[in-house]
A protein has these predicted regions:
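Membrane-spanning beta-strand positions in outer-membrane beta-barrel proteins
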Residues: 31-37, 79-81, 102, 106, ...
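Membrane-embedded beta-strands of outer-membrane beta-barrel proteins
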Residues: 16-20, 67-69, 99-101, 115, ...
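Outer-membrane beta-barrel domain signature, especially the mid-to-C-terminal portions
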Residues: 51, 59-61, 98, 123-153, ...
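Outer-membrane beta-barrel strand-turn architecture
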Residues: 24-30, 72-77, 97, 105-109, ...
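Face-selective signature of the C-terminal outer-membrane beta-barrel domain
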Residues: 1-93, 175-177
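Membrane-embedded beta-barrel scaffold of Gram-negative outer-membrane proteins
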Residues: 1, 106, 114, 148-187
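Residue-level preference for beta-strand/loop junctions
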Residues: 12-14, 32, 63, 95, ...
Length: 187
């Protein structure tokens, strides 16, 4: 046993986010009342991790500038949402567009049916938790990002049915939900 004095070090991980959002409600947008939402976001993460005994020094600055928008048409029985997000990550040379869509149908006031699609990504970067998870088991990992890494992509589909019923002062709820997620370029 005993402690491994080489395993000690210092980590700082400072993250901050700022953004703004605008919402506009239409009495009628093409065929139905709608709410438009648009906005901007900026996210920065500064990670420094020094493990002196193993000569492992990590310094990483991540900056992500984003713009997002969506329009949701809705009435009592239907809602249909189309939206997207543009992200520019400083560790990638291109902008990523992530679309999303959602459909809701209420055939009765006690039944809610939904279907949704979304696309997402994760940029190749070192995460603080990846640097230290092996330490818990008594080993140390040396992490270096490969130069040819591309973003990890995900596509998700989900469907659900939600039923509600009241018995006097009590309400019951039955939710049945299924989803599928496909990952590509996993790192």
């Amino acid at each position: 046993g005993g402690q491994d004095v080489n395993a000690y070090g210092a980590t700082t991980d400072f993250t901050w986010v700022t953004g703004s959002q605008y919402i506009y409600s239409f009495d009628k947008c093409f065929f139905m009342p709608a709410d438009f939402t648009g906005g901007l976001e900026y996210n920065q993460d500064n990670l420094t991790d020094d493990m002196w005994g193993y000569n492992r020094y990590t310094k990483q600055e991540v900056r992500i500038a984003s713009a997002f928008f969506q329009n949701e048409w809705k009435n009592k029985q239907w809602s249909f949402l189309l939206g997207g997000r543009l992200d520019k990550h400083n560790m990638m040379d291109h902008v990523i567009f992530s679309p999303r869509a959602n459909l809701r149908y209420n055939p009765t006031e006690n039944m809610n049916l939904r279907a949704s699609y979304s696309f997402g990504f994760r940029a190749p970067q070192a995460f603080d938790e990846d640097l230290h998870i092996e330490n818990v088991g008594g080993t140390v990992s040396m992490i270096e990002l490969a130069k040819d890494l591309t973003e990890e992509k995900s596509q998700s589909l989900s469907i659900s049915g939600d039923l509600y019923h009241r018995w006097g002062d009590f309400q019951g709820n039955l939710l049945i939900e299924g989803f599928y997620t496909s990952l590509s370029d996993v790192f």
